[in-house]
Amino acid sequence: MANMRNIILTALLSAIALVSGYVEGLDDKFTEFRQNELWLVEFYAPWCAYCHTFEPVWTEVGAELKSLGSPVNVGKIDTTAHTSIATEFNIRGYPTIKLFKGDLSFDYKGPRTKDGIIEFTNRVSGPVVRPLSSVQLFQHVMSRHDVIFVYIGGESLLKKEYYKAATEFIVHTYFFTASEEILPKAVTLQDVPAVAVFKDGTYYIYNEFIDGDLSSWINRERFLSYFQIDSYSLYQMGELSKLVALAVVDEKNPSEESIRYKTLMERVSTEYRDHYKSDFQFGYVDGNEYVNGLIMGELAMPSIIVLNMSIDGYYIPESSTETIEDLLQFLNSVLDGSTTLLGGNGFWQCAKRIFYKGKNTVMSMVETAPVFSCFVLGLPVGVVVLVIYATCTAVPADDEKPEEEATASPALDTHGKKAIESQPESTEKTSEAKKED
């Protein structure tokens, strides 16, 4: 029985060591060899609570990529031990995930899941723009991805702009090239070359005169018109010029009101797309945690809210939203400025947000790493206490002695007086001595 237990324990430890071996611990020397290979790297800190939660996921990512025969190496770096690395790559949050491809580095900003990270890795590590050579391949790609961009045509200035934009946005979505022959029969083009986005079960053609810069158009169109938005997608929308119209609901406890809010949002996103496509991104979020952090308060569920992610501002309807007309009226009031903007990035709001985030960070640190947190928080307090104690108990310097002598003058005067009174006796003795001589 004991032998069987030892065998199982040995096998378990061997499996853990084998899986952990797929993730390489890196140090400052990483900068010397990173350009020669593809690397997917996690930058973490020991005090980061989420980094500990995320560690098994990262191990799974390393094992999965290895089993798929991926050329991408997986590693991790402790930025508290290798501070120069954190400075060089401008690491500001934890965990930060970057893919290094030659001289370029790409930040992963999606959900911290194995599937999401592996999809990002496969997309970014391969060609920036991939050719679609057959109708079957086109249909296969369409079935696998919610949003794809396709360049149709031969060499042109538009193609150069397309490749440049693809390099910028490959971290978010897929880019392909195709000829007219392999497109679905339902797709009709006015001119070639052209750029199209396929999403929402249909397609939209880029028009330079209406849509403006190609890169900006791709940035606006890389999301579905209406979808479930998580905190990572919401964070990315700070890069858009759009406002984000949300139904905030609790999917675990659905209600008639929450279903109505979601339905209204979806209807507006499709039925009024041409009217609002440049101004609003529509969706819904499950839970109010991220929104609460943004507004620094508690938002009731279900609710409707419009976020301006570029300035951390938000709008809330002043009356109930019962019909699509009510929602349209609210959206129009946001655009014409008749609804009050709350929050924002003013001085006091920024100060309040810093305090709010700092408080949450400290609470998270104390909950997950109490000993380390006590050291980090107690060290500066201890230094201040020592400085105050040293100041209060300091020995007076030499230049302060005259003041002490001045305060002791009465005693000195007394002694001085006695010294003067004794002088006549010595004078008399001296005179008598002279007479005797």
From Swiss-Prot:
<keyword id="KW-0732">Signal</keyword>
<dbReference type="InterPro" id="IPR017937">
    <property type="entry name" value="Thioredoxin_CS"/>
</dbReference>
<dbReference type="InterPro" id="IPR013766">
    <property type="entry name" value="Thioredoxin_domain"/>
</dbReference>
<feature type="glycosylation site" description="N-linked (GlcNAc...) asparagine">
    <location>
        <position position="308"/>
    </location>
</feature>
<keyword id="KW-1133">Transmembrane helix</keyword>
<feature type="region of interest" description="Disordered">
    <location>
        <begin position="398"/>
        <end position="437"/>
    </location>
</feature>
<keyword id="KW-0812">Transmembrane</keyword>
<dbReference type="GO" id="GO:0001654">
    <property type="term" value="P:eye development"/>
</dbReference>
<feature type="active site" description="Nucleophile">
    <location>
        <position position="51"/>
    </location>
</feature>
<dbReference type="GO" id="GO:0009986">
    <property type="term" value="C:cell surface"/>
</dbReference>
<dbReference type="GO" id="GO:0016853">
    <property type="term" value="F:isomerase activity"/>
</dbReference>
<feature type="topological domain" description="Extracellular">
    <location>
        <begin position="22"/>
        <end position="368"/>
    </location>
</feature>
<feature type="short sequence motif" description="Di-lysine motif">
    <location>
        <begin position="434"/>
        <end position="437"/>
    </location>
</feature>
<keyword id="KW-0676">Redox-active center</keyword>
<feature type="topological domain" description="Cytoplasmic">
    <location>
        <begin position="390"/>
        <end position="437"/>
    </location>
</feature>
<feature type="domain" description="Thioredoxin">
    <location>
        <begin position="22"/>
        <end position="126"/>
    </location>
</feature>
<keyword id="KW-0413">Isomerase</keyword>
<dbReference type="InterPro" id="IPR052250">
    <property type="entry name" value="PDI_TMX3"/>
</dbReference>
<feature type="active site" description="Nucleophile">
    <location>
        <position position="48"/>
    </location>
</feature>
<feature type="signal peptide">
    <location>
        <begin position="1"/>
        <end position="21"/>
    </location>
</feature>
<keyword id="KW-0325">Glycoprotein</keyword>
<feature type="transmembrane region" description="Helical">
    <location>
        <begin position="369"/>
        <end position="389"/>
    </location>
</feature>
<feature type="disulfide bond" description="Redox-active">
    <location>
        <begin position="48"/>
        <end position="51"/>
    </location>
</feature>
<keyword id="KW-1015">Disulfide bond</keyword>
<feature type="compositionally biased region" description="Basic and acidic residues">
    <location>
        <begin position="414"/>
        <end position="437"/>
    </location>
</feature>
<comment type="function">
    <text>Probable disulfide isomerase, which participates in the folding of proteins containing disulfide bonds. May act as a dithiol oxidase. Acts as a regulator of endoplasmic reticulum-mitochondria contact sites via its ability to regulate redox signals.</text>
</comment>
<dbReference type="InterPro" id="IPR036249">
    <property type="entry name" value="Thioredoxin-like_sf"/>
</dbReference>
<protein>
    <recommendedName>
        <fullName>Protein disulfide-isomerase tmx3a</fullName>
        <ecNumber>5.3.4.1</ecNumber>
    </recommendedName>
</protein>
<dbReference type="Pfam" id="PF13848">
    <property type="entry name" value="Thioredoxin_6"/>
</dbReference>
<dbReference type="Pfam" id="PF00085">
    <property type="entry name" value="Thioredoxin"/>
</dbReference>
<dbReference type="GO" id="GO:0005789">
    <property type="term" value="C:endoplasmic reticulum membrane"/>
</dbReference>
<keyword id="KW-0256">Endoplasmic reticulum</keyword>
<dbReference type="GO" id="GO:0005783">
    <property type="term" value="C:endoplasmic reticulum"/>
</dbReference>
<keyword id="KW-0472">Membrane</keyword>
